[in-house]
């Protein structure tokens, strides 16, 4: 019985550590890097300080209709025309990208980088981390 408990605790601790480490390895944000990984509060501050930011929601249209960040443009990463539509955005302006939980938007960041966007901000944990009091 005690070994079951020990193994269970080890699995939980290992999973928790791996999840955090996976986030850090997959999505490093360093000063001067092409992309910054922001929490909801930091994203809110960014939007206040940079009102010219293009807010890109890469969730499905159904998710977008259920609620979105103020001023967001919805271009679903699941669309076959995603790259074409994103390429029409202004590459000289900052882009704040998000999805529901942070996974799809990470894929979008890669596409944005490949298309030549230089100032990309990403909301870590996505829309689910956005609270009403986080709004600008």
Roles of regions detected by a PLM:
Residues 1-49, 53, 61-94, 100-136:
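Rhodanese-like catalytic fold shared by cysteine-dependent sulfurtransferases
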């Amino acid at each position: 019985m005690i070994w079951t408990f020990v193994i269970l605790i080890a699995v939980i601790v290992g999973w928790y550590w791996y999840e955090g480490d996976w986030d850090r390895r997959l999505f490093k944000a360093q000063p001067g890097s092409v992309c910054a990984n922001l929490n909801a509060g930091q994203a809110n501050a960014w939007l206040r300080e940079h009102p010219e930011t293009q807010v890109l929601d890469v969730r499905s249209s159904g998710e977008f209709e259920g609620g979105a960040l103020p001023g967001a443009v919805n271009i679903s990463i699941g669309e076959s025309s995603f790259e074409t539509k994103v390429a029409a955005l202004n590459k000289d302006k900052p882009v704040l990208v998000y999805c529901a939980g942070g996974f799809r938007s990470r894929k979008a960041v890669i596409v944005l980088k490949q298309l030549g966007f230089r100032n990309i901000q990403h909301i870590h944990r996505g829309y689910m981390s956005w609270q009403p009091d986080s709004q600008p």
